[in-house]
Amino acid sequence: MFKGIFIKNFFNLIINQGINILIALLATRILFSTLGEAQYGLVNLALSVVLLSSITVSYGYHLNGPKRIALFRDESAKKETLINEIIATRIIIAFGMAIILFCLTYFFGFFKSYAALLYYSLILLFSQALFPMFYFQGNDKIAWASLVNAFAKGAYLLLIVLFIKIPEDATYVNFLFGITALIVYIVTWIIIYKKE
């Protein structure tokens, strides 16, 4: 049984990473040709700053979260309390990191050349806070993670095609990335809570 779950999860993770690579390649081609070299570089710079900051948002929870979820698999009240604690803590940390980045930019002049782009990118911290991978890993439901990821990335790619038309739209690229993930993750958590 364990071997079957391991193989299934392994292939689902491969599919998940394949989707990530495919969407990244398509988005890169579209964004680079639409935004130009300079704006595309700033988009990725802002994305890098926020993603590095988001490490603190998920710090430790991607390791101990699945283990603790697995321990409470058959105890729905304890599992729900644990999920609430993890999500609440991650959201509080996301707010803290957003405030720190805002203050560094607004008051101290860090990231000044792409401040607006960075502000719009802060939503990625909150989408990271709601990322349900720890839940799927703890319940051996990696296929769900692949499905959620595919939906979020597909919606992001569609929004890029629809709304990113000129170099000045660079400000909104990371916002679209964050908002699609955030909405998909909120809907996913609603479904999870209804099923639990």
Model-found features: residue ranges?
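Membrane-interface junctions at transmembrane-helix termini in multi-pass inner-membrane proteins
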Residues: K3, A115, L125-V148
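Helix-loop junctions and terminal segments of transmembrane helices
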Residues: V57-D74
